[in-house]
């Protein structure tokens, strides 16, 4: 008989991105959509952003992260993953709530793209004005 592997789940959202995150005790490997995080995300700054919950809780290298993410662009996806990791860490140990909350990692960022209005070229950009 095998023991069930301990795993913590968290769902993160940002803009139009949704990330389903699973934390498994391990060496600190991060896999996004079955690819290594360095292969999936093009910028080092996004990877640093994504690791912020581990830095705040001082758990870097304690968990392997398995992520399924869809929707949005690279930045939205990275921040959705960060949100999901923070929620999963909270499930792993409720003691982390204070430090994660102070760092603003548990709050869902509500900012979304503003819709285009009729008669305008974009959300707020109006057509070019011609005096004559």
Swiss-Prot record:
It holds the Pfam family Ribosomal_S9. Belongs to the universal ribosomal protein uS9 family. NCBIfam families: PRK00132.1. It comes from Staphylococcus aureus (strain NCTC 8325 / PS 47). This is Small ribosomal subunit protein uS9. Residues 101-132 are annotated as: Disordered. Keywords: Ribonucleoprotein, Ribosomal protein. GO terms for biological process: translation.
